[in-house]
């Protein structure tokens, strides 16, 4: 038996498979992303997800088998989000001056994201629990799952909607901002980043951080505000209405 096949058989039967597959695929996707001058359509998260999902389907490996190893990377999502606070700390003077406008923008953006998703769900006559799963689509996936569970949605589906939303934001953000002629000076990067973090949570924030430090800092702020506001207001709104 060729050594590669022996290695594949060994890895696919152990938790090392998910960890190894995720790291290898992402490193290759990141290298391609760099070679393509960080083109939005070459987003490494998008192509990593598509490659791994296609590989699991082609090899008939179950998701629990894959996640047994990938969970070690999943654990790092929390520290990675917390690390976004450092660029914000470096810009604390700007935050003090604009906290009111930023909070209002976060409220408006979060409301628009949830309301538009619910309206589309009802317009297409989707099942009620699917519609509820759309409400937290612009919040990072673990939080979206918790919110969906509280309001009667499907947590796993909410996570899928959140990831897809983040990818769409990361892919389309630059083109939309350029079309709207959002400037690329310091205030413009702040606005771009805040919008990406509001609409695309962690995936959008990661894209913003790759492009500009100011954009990344304010995307991280928007991500945190959306987590806080959505966790409080979405369950409250469904309880009232």
Summary of predicted features, one role per range:
Residues 6-22, 29-89, 94, 100-101, ...:
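Helical membrane-embedded segments and adjacent short helical loop/helix-boundary regions
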Residues 16-20, 24, 43-46, 168, ...:
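Short, contiguous, pocket-lining structural segments
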Residues 18-31, 49, 53, 57, ...:
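Transmembrane alpha-helical segments of multi-pass membrane transport proteins and ion-pumping complexes
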Residues 37-38, 61, 88-100, 124-129, ...:
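Juxtamembrane helix-boundary/capping and inter-helix hinge elements in multi-pass membrane proteins
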Residues 41, 45, 71, 76-78, ...:
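Hydrophobic alpha-helical transmembrane segments of integral membrane proteins
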Residues 90-167:
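Internal active-site segments that recognize and position negatively charged phosphoryl groups
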Residues 130-157, 161-164, 186-225:
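Alpha-helical membrane segments and immediately flanking helix-loop junctions
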């Amino acid at each position: 038996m060729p050594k590669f096949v022996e290695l594949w058989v060994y890895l696919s039967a152990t938790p090392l498979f998910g960890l190894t597959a995720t790291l290898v695929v992402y490193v290759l996707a990141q290298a391609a992303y760099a070679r393509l001058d960080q083109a939005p359509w070459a987003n490494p998260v998008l192509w990593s997800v598509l490659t791994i999902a296609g590989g699991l389907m082609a090899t008939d490996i179950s998701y629990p088998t894959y996640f047994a190893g990938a969970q070690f990377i999943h654990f790092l999502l929390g520290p990675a989000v917390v690390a976004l606070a450092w660029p914000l700390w470096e810009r604390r003077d700007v935050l003090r001056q604009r906290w009111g406008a930023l909070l209002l923008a976060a409220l408006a953006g979060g409301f628009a994201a949830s309301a538009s998703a619910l309206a589309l769900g009802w317009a297409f006559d989707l099942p009620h629990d699917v519609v509820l799963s759309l409400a937290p689509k612009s919040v990072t996936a673990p939080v979206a799952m918790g919110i969906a569970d509280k309001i009667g949605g499907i947590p796993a589906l909410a996570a899928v909607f959140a990831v897809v939303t983040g990818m769409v934001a990361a892919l389309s953000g630059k083109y939309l901002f350029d079309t709207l002629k959002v400037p690329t000076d310091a205030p413009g990067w702040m606005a771009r980043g805040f919008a990406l973090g509001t609409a695309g949570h962690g995936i959008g924030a990661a894209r913003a951080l790759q492009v500009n430090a100011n954009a990344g800092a304010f995307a991280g702020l928007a991500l945190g505000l959306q987590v806080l506001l959505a966790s409080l207001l979405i369950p409250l709104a469904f309880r009232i209405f």
